[in-house]
């Protein structure tokens, strides 16, 4: 049974590394590079990126949470409600709440906001003076702030 605990523990760690790694790569590397591209290329890149990383975020985030819960309860010391009042139990609860908050932020306003941004044709129409549409700039800034909050949550 010890080997199952080891597998659950390290799969949990590996998925968490993948989750954070994707978020850092997208937020710190790919988003700034994309922002330097012309608008049509930005949009095409964003659409392709979303199709690729969206499922990975779901698998990595969901797997991290599921295996973390299993590691703390089934394969860990939290076998009764009283155990949740221990230092480990309280740490487990705080970690779970923070993880759920990051997952909700990433899957909700950030993920859905990015999907809406790249799907909305009207946002990507450049004005006659070649200026960026204010709604596009506002949406990109909002996503940038949300991405920073997500990274801060990790």
Which residue stretches match the model-derived regions?
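Polytopic transmembrane helical bundles with strong interfacial aromatic enrichment
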Residues: 1-154
